[in-house]
Amino acid sequence: MDFRVSREAFLRVLTHVSSIVDSRSTIPILSNIYLKCENNQIEIRSTDMDISIREFVSCDSTKNGEATVNSRILTDIIRKTKKNSIVKLKLEGNRLIINSDNSVFELNALSADEFPKFVPLDPTNSFDLTIPQMKRLFNKTKFAISAEETRYYLNGIYFHTVSNGSKTALRCVATDGHRLAKTELDLSNNVNISGIILPRKFILQLDRILGDFEGKVKMICTDTQVSLEADNFIIISKLIDGTFPDYEKVIPVSNDKLLQVEAESFFNAIDRVSTVNQDKTPTVKLQFENNSIKIMATSTDSNKGDEEVAASYAAEALEILFNSKYILDLQDVIEGETMILELLNQSSPVIVKDPKDATSLYILMPMRI
């Protein structure tokens, strides 16, 4: 294997591929990335046995070949080389020689035969989305993914299709048991996804990587795996093997008290008042009455803060306690200037809606007063 490659193009792909590599893996080959040079193209792969990534980059090759080398070391070397330079890589026996300007590096290379194979998914159940559409679906819901490993079936986004009139919609739902986020997108083709759970790690990897691509992505779903393809990039992930709860049952249908408030003012007030509460579970008490919201916070060491925000509210007075962090997490998903809260009583779930986005809905569970 002998090739020359642009430092920028090579580093871009290495950054993508190395993002899933576990440097602490007890299986040495999994700390490596796979390199294959063939016909002026480099194939670069990595896997942690749950997620696999493959990407191609153009090069000027004089000899084909393949090998695996330590992912972190190779990526760091290329990152520290001179910008806009040409990097030369050559395999000599079990050593990968790297040349850049006046620098020369030698890395130990393991046989490519030991590296796990990459098997693309059957594209029978596939559909195309634009990258902004894909990012929007994930960004609207990922904040509600549970990090509690004992409830592993909540450690991802529930992905399924629903009938939306004459169209099919792709719906994403996430919940940690204290809040829920739901959004959907109409599809142009009649794909059928009965219900799969995309792992949190897969979602976060895509969030880091998709910003480097433009145009469309192809998503393929099977009963056990999911893949996403964009340009010369493909990522495949195992699905979470579990049953997502019936989320429809926790969406209230009788919340009859409506409140509308200017979103930025509301979030800023929550942020200011909650500053006094540095407890592990920061709380704020909201009093709804007479076209206003009174926001109050008290910490275990007797710090206090309160602020009143104007709102449109004509129902009976109500007092509800919330985790302030859960409210503030909504700041990144509310697009409109105002937001709507649908209330029932101090112990029932609260529905949060964005007048500018009819496709999304959020649920907040109150805390005990």
Where are these regions (language model features)?
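Structural preference for solvent-exposed beta-strand-turn elements
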Residues: M1-I369
